[in-house]
Design a protein with these regions (language model features):
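Helical element adjacent to the flavin cofactor pocket in flavoenzyme catalytic cores
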Residues: 1-38
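C-terminal lid/capping helical subdomain adjacent to the catalytic/cofactor pocket in oxidative enzymes
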Residues: 6, 160-193
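Residues located in well-ordered beta-strands
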Residues: 13-16, 69, 137
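Central helical "cap/lid" subdomain
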Residues: 29-77
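Alpha-helix/helix-capping structural signal
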Residues: 45-46, 124, 180
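A short alpha-helix-loop-beta-strand transition element characteristic
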Residues: 58-60, 135, 192-193
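Active-site lid/adjacent beta-loop-alpha segment flanking the redox-cofactor pocket in flavoenzymes
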Residues: 72-163
Length: 193
């Protein structure tokens, strides 16, 4: 990203936006102001927080999605397995770990720590599909927040504020769709359509 002219500023919180006469002028941050003619909001589960700073209400809710990874085993899975009715997915990493997840906590939250009942549900569904999973030790779990749109469809569009663009509401598919969403979002911003 660096070689393409992108600056990634870590631990830098957005505190507001500079909007004048319906046109975006910049972003206010904990490390100073950044002037820009075009700004894209693509912030996973924090979209509503930033939208509220702009007096916008979006049709998305923030939820926690958990995942876990097992000890490594010999290669057995070269694709992603999903079970929609059970809210479960599984793939195998290059190191042989089984990466699993799928269900979300049943309430809106910005917390990034999971709970055991949700993880148990995911693993129960996984074992029902692939019984060999019951023999594996889980090495770690983690959670991350994401935007969920009401119909499960992502939102990539310009807003009523000239120069401000949205990429949100990806639900379960955000990580898997990141490459395509990046190209689409870049096109939307560059072409303003």
């Amino acid at each position: 990203a660096d070689s393409m002219g992108v600056d990634i500023i870590q631990n830098c919180e957005v505190t507001g936006f500079d909007v004048s006469n319906g046109v975006i002028k910049g972003v206010k941050t904990s490390k100073g102001n950044i002037k820009a003619k075009k700004i894209g909001l693509c912030v996973a589960g924090s979209t509503n927080i930033l939208a509220e700073m702009l007096n916008m209400t979006l049709p998305v809710e923030t939820h926690l999605l958990q995942a876990c990874v097992s000890e490594p085993i010999k290669p057995i899975l070269d694709h992603v397995v999903t079970f929609g009715a059970g809210h479960f997915y599984c793939s195998q990493s290059d190191k042989g770990e089984m990466v699993m997840g799928g269900d979300l906590d049943g309430y809106n939250s910005y917390a990034q720590r999971g709970n055991l009942p949700t993880l148990q549900h995911v693993l129960t569904e996984g074992i029902a599909m692939m019984p060999f999973l019951s023999k594996l030790k889980m090495l770690r779990t983690w959670g991350g927040i994401m935007d969920m749109s009401m119909d499960g469809s992502p939102i990539i569009d310009k807003t009523h504020i000239k120069g401000l663009y949205l990429n949100c509401g990806w639900c379960y598919g955000g990580f898997k769709a990141t490459p395509a969403s990046g190209w689409t979002f870049a096109h939307t911003i560059a072409q303003d359509r």
